Amino acid sequence: MSKTSKAYRAAAEKIDAGRLYTPLAAAKAVKETSSKNFDATVDVAIRLGVDPRKADQLVRGTVSLPNGTGKEVRVVVFAEGPNATAAEEAGADVVGTAELIEKIQGGWTDFDAAIATPDQMAKVGRVARVLGPRGLMPNPKTGTVTTDVAKAVAEIKGGKISFRVDKAANLHAILGKASFTEKQLAENYGALIDELLRLKPSSSKGRYFKKVTMSSTNGPGVPVDNTIVKDFTEEA
């Protein structure tokens, strides 16, 4: 839906802009205002009370969503020998080193996550300028540089997502699909909030969750009560 389309305006009119919705109510509103032409992706945008310019306030991490993401995740793995075999058996979409790196250097980035064994990182560094800006560069902090590639592939395929605050202290994450129940979306939201609370920098002062908005692909944003940090599936 274009923000100027009749369908978008009709959907936006269903949202009470002056209300702060509970996570469950927000999920219900997002489902009701999502496109009926396809199974839209549901996302959340969170503005954190941090200063990303300070290294100790650069919030980033991963979380396994209890209900998955609802989308097919394409995973590539930089590995050789037994590790490559393990990655293939775990369901990785593309596994390799030299040929894979050459393919990426040629502009191919048709995948959602990249994993590498530690011994391959020097080679992977050759495509850092391609992967980095897209958030695809393997990193030990997100569990994507590992010797247990099978576990990493299984986790990502099963609903593990990565998140990172941007320069404006905003963070975006997928919560699932509009076909999910509102309870499933609220549970996934709760898992993300729990992990963000665990990662809260000790040097961060004031309100940690400044603004939270839930929305579907091209749908209107639904303001979420940013003071709710538990009991995510309770009714309003």
Curated annotation (Swiss-Prot):
Q: Can you name one GO molecular function term for this protein?
A: tRNA binding
The record's listing under InterPro entries reads: Ribosom_uL1_bac-type, Ribosomal_uL1, Ribosomal_uL1-like, Ribosomal_uL1/biogenesis, Ribosomal_uL1_3-a/b-sand, Ribosomal_uL1_CS
Q: Which GO terms describe its biological process?
A: regulation of translation; translation
| Keywords associated with the record | Repressor, Ribonucleoprotein, Ribosomal protein, RNA-binding, rRNA-binding, Translation regulation, tRNA-binding
Q: Gene Ontology terms, cellular component aspect? A: large ribosomal subunit
Which CDD domains does the UniProt entry name for this protein? Ribosomal_L1 (cd00403)
Q: Which Gene3D superfamilies match?
A: 3.30.190.20, 3.40.50.790
One matching Pfam family, short form? Ribosomal_L1
List the SUPFAM superfamilies: Ribosomal protein L1 (SSF56808)
PROSITE patterns found in the cross-reference section: RIBOSOMAL_L1
Task: Kindly state the subunit structure of this protein.
Answer: Part of the 50S ribosomal subunit.
Designated name of the protein: Large ribosomal subunit protein uL1
Organism, by scientific name, is: Corynebacterium jeikeium (strain K411)
Gene name of the record? rplA
